[in-house]
Amino acid sequence: MAAPSPTKTTWKLQEIVAHGCSVSSVVLGRSSGRLVATGGDDCRVHLWSVNKPNCIMSLTGHTTPVESVRFNNSEELIVAGSQSGSLRIWDLEAAKILRTLMGHKANVSSLDFHPYGEFVASGSLDTNIKLWDVRRKGCVFRYKGHTQAVRCLRFSPDGKWLASASDDHSVKLWDLTAGKMMAELSEHKGPVNIIEFHPNEYLLASGSADRTVRFWDLEKFQLVGCTEGETIPVRAILFSNDGGCIFCGGKDSLRVYGWEPDQCFDTVPVGWGKVSDLAICNNQLIGVSSAQSNISSFVVDLTRVKMTGCAPQGPVPAEIPISQPAPTGTSLRRIYERPSTTCSKPNRVSPTSDDEEKESRAEIQNPEDYKEIFQPKNAISRTPPRNSEPFPAPPEDDISIVKEAVAPTPDVVTPATSNKKNTEQLQRPPVAASTPIVCQEPSPVPAPQSKPPVISAARNEPIGLKAADFLPAVKSSSPTEVVDDEAVSQIRKGHDTMCMVLTSRMRNLDTVRAVWSSGDIKTSIDSAVAINDLSVVVDLLNIINQKASLWKLDLCMTVLPQIEKMLQSKYESYVQTGCISLKLILQRFLPLITDILAAPPSVGVDISREERLSKCKLCYKQLRILSPLVKSKASQSGRYGSAFRELHLLMSGLE
C-alpha cells in the first residue's frame, strides 16, 4: 500500500525537556539549521539536534544562570553569557573551553560572532557593548550610548558595522574601524527586541515591542518601510536566503512581508507559541520555542508559502532547481562587499589555562551523535560539503504529532540511546578528525526548589481554563460512558458560564470606556480599580504604556498598589504589564520623588508643594513595599528574571 503524499505546510518535529529548570535562551545554528543550543537556570548550555531527543553535549563552567547563547557562522564555536556578566566560548569540535571573558557589570543579554575575524560582541543590562578579541582574550573596544539594556547585536555581512538594539526604543549603528557611532534609528515606539541585516543590500530590519517590523536604508539611514498586523511584540525575524522577503515569527503564526511597497505576502498558522529563533535550510524554515523547561521545534515548508506577489507553486521535485523570486526592494541599493578569504575555516585558537579547563567542561552526552556532527569519519577537507536532506512532511490526514519525545535532563545519569532509522544525520563541512575528550558522567544534582506556578503566554492551549472548573462536581460511584445528550448538556453548561464571565468583563470595560472617552485618564483608572477587576486595569495600562507622556504623579499613586498585585499574579501577561508600568514609573518619577523628599522645607505656605510632597511620600512608601518583591524575583531566569533584575537596578536609589 502506497504511503500518502506529504501535503502539510507546517508540522511539529519534537518537544523535549531541555533542562531541569527554566530555559532562558534558545538559539538555532544558522548554517545547518539542525543544531539547537539552550541555556538554563542550571548554569549549563546544552546542545541538541532539532529532530533528536537526546542531548549531544553539555557545556559547564558558568556559576550563574545562562542568559544568552550564540553560534558562530560555521557552528564550530559557541559563546554563552551569564547573569554575572561573564562570557565563555567553547570549541565544539575539540570539546574544550576556549576562552573566559570578564568585564560586564550586569547580565549579558545579547551576543554575536564576527562573520570573518575572530571577534565576539556582547551587550548587557549595564547598557554597554563590548568587542572582544578571542585570540588575545581581551576587550578591544567598548561602545557607550544606549541608556537601557542592549537586547540584540548583529554584525553586518561585510563585517565592518555593528548594529545594536535596546530597550531605549533605538537602534544604533557602530563603525568598527573608527570605533564610533554612525547613526541612531529611533522611530520605534517600544523596546527593540531583534535586528537583522539584509544578506546582500544595505538594508536593516528591526522588530520591536510596538508590534512592528521596520526597514531602514543604510545608505541614507532613513525609514523605508513598516509592517502592521502583529498581535504581540516581535522577537524573531529572518530574511530569506535571496533577500526577497522577510519572515516574522509571531504568536502561533508566521508572516511573510515585503517592503517598498510594504505588503504581507502570506500568513501561515504554526503552533509554536512564542517562537524564539528561526533558520532556513533546504527550502524549509525551522523554528524553535521554549516554555519553562521545555523546547519545541517546528518546520514550515517554504515551497508552500507565498513569498512574492504571486501564488506559491506547491512542492517542487528535488531534481528540478527552484527559481528564486526577484527581491521586492529596490535594485539600486548598494550591495555589501565581502572581503576575500583564502580559507573559510578560522585558525585554531589555543585553549585557556588548565584551571579554567577543569572548571569549564564539555560533557559529551551522546558520543555517536557528537561524532556524526562534529567529527565525521573519512572526511576530506577539500571535498565540498554535502547538503542535509530536508525533513519529511507527515501526511495531511495524520493528525498525530510527528515526534513528541521527552528526554531526561542531562544532569541525571541515564543511558542515552540513539535511533538512527528515524532521525536525519546532520551534514557539516568536513573537518579534520580528532579524538574528543570524553568527560565523566555528571553527578546527579538536587531537584530544583518548587516555584509558584506561572501561566505562560507562550502556550498552544489555555492553561487553568477548563470547563469542568465552572461546573458543579458530579458524584459517580463508577465511570460510565457518556451519551451524546449528556455531553452536549455539559458543553452547554460550560458555555453559559463562560458567556457570563465574558459578559461581565465586557460590562466592566464599557463602564471604564465611558469615562475614558471623556479624556480623564486618572478617573478611568480609579473606576477600573473600584470595579475590582485586575484584567481591566491590565487592559488600561497596556494602552497607557504605549505613550509614556500620559503618566502623571497622581496616576502613579493609584497604579502602584495594582502593580503589586500584577507582579504576584500567576499570569505572565499580568506580570509583564506590571514590569513595564513599574519601569516607566521608576524612569520618569523616581528622580523627581527623591529630589522633592530630599529638598529642605520652604518658608511660608505653598499648597501646591505640599500636595506634591504628599503624593511623593505615598509613591515612595509603595515603592519601598515593592522593592523586596522585585528583589526576590530577580533570581529567576529568562526574560522574567532579566526584567526584575533591571527593575532592581532602577530601584537601587531607594536604599
Curated annotation (Swiss-Prot):
The entry's keywords: Cell cycle, Cell division, Cytoplasm, Cytoskeleton, Microtubule, Mitosis, Repeat, WD repeat
Extent of Basic and acidic residues compositional bias: 358-374
Ranges annotated as biased composition (Polar residues): 339-352, 415-426
Residue ranges of WD repeats: 18-58, 61-100, 103-142, 145-184, 187-226, 229-269
Keyword Cell division in record: yes
Chain spans, region Disordered: 338-397, 411-431
GO biological process: cell division; microtubule depolymerization; microtubule severing
Molecular function terms from GO: microtubule binding
Compartments it resides in: Cytoplasm; Cytoplasm, Cytoskeleton, Microtubule organizing center, Centrosome; Cytoplasm, Cytoskeleton, Spindle pole; Cytoplasm, Cytoskeleton
Gene3D superfamilies on file: YVTN repeat-like/Quinoprotein amine dehydrogenase
Record InterPro entries: G-protein_beta_WD-40_rep, Katanin_C-terminal, KTNB1, WD40/YVTN_repeat-like_dom_sf, WD40_repeat_CS, WD40_repeat_dom_sf, WD40_rpt
Location, primary (coarse class): cytoplasm
Gene Ontology CC terms, in alphabetical order: centrosome; cytoplasm; katanin complex; microtubule; spindle; spindle pole
Quaternary structure, from the entry: Interacts with katna1. This interaction enhances the microtubule binding and severing activity of katna1 and also targets this activity to the centrosome.
Record's function text: Participates in a complex which severs microtubules in an ATP-dependent manner. May act to target the enzymatic subunit of this complex to sites of action such as the centrosome. Microtubule severing may promote rapid reorganization of cellular microtubule arrays and the release of microtubules from the centrosome following nucleation.
PANTHER family in the record: KATANIN P80 SUBUNIT (PTHR19845), KATANIN P80 WD40 REPEAT-CONTAINING SUBUNIT B1 (PTHR19845:SF0)
Similarity comment: family membership: Belongs to the WD repeat KATNB1 family.
Protein name, per record: Katanin p80 WD40 repeat-containing subunit B1
Biological source species: Xenopus laevis
